[in-house]
Amino acid sequence: MLLMDWQGVLSGQPLQWIISGFLTTLWVTLAGVAVATLFALLLLGLRLTGNRVATAVVGVWVSAFRNTPLLVQLMFWYFAAWNWLPRDVITFINAEHPWSVLPGDVWWLTPEFLCSAWGLGVFTSAFLVEEIASGLQAVSAGQREAAIAQGFSAWAAFRHILLPQGLANAWQPIVGQYLNLMKLSSLASGIGFAELTYQVRQIESYNAHALEAFAVGTALYLFFGIVLGMLLTRLGPKSASGKPFRVRTRPFSFRSILHDR
């Protein structure tokens, strides 16, 4: 019978590695979410201009990031693009700065952290802009026509009528993309970033407690995902009653398919 030795993971140096890895995953996820949101909004703005060049730029961005593996992208940013930065910038980032330490003793001004947050962010932005665009397309054309008839300008109609409904339609897929970013942060271990997966593998090499280490790592990812999902749902678009929008779906069945036909 296989006996589990939790003391080999939940005490001493392995425990410190687990805590450090979890906090590092937390911070790089938040940084990646910020980068992804910023770029998704910029890309959405370009697409809404209707300009052919701007639309083409968005199309190339989405195609490039959605159709290449994230691990390859992270390696590109870390091993190739990083060396294109001016030498003074690289020297400044590699130096130790007291103000660059986040709570939990996580250093954010490092090549590994910056490349991981950037890579996760730009990768996720390509998916986010499509989710938001789909949500906006799901808003009926009558909503815009009614807003214009009521005297709203085109921008006011978009800001106060179309965008809130579009975000409500797309919010659950958006939350899913943010959660996916959190899970994909484990790939950053491939460039030597000491997040949770990296630290779990380090414990495996340190004392061969692989099963216990990966069990704890899995539990922490699950905990983080549940908490993050709940927070994002609460922060999402609210209905007039102040409650989060909920998309109503019918249970899947072959009878429903035949009925729709």
Which residue stretches match the model-derived regions?
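Transmembrane alpha-helices and adjacent helix-loop boundaries
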Residues: 1-261
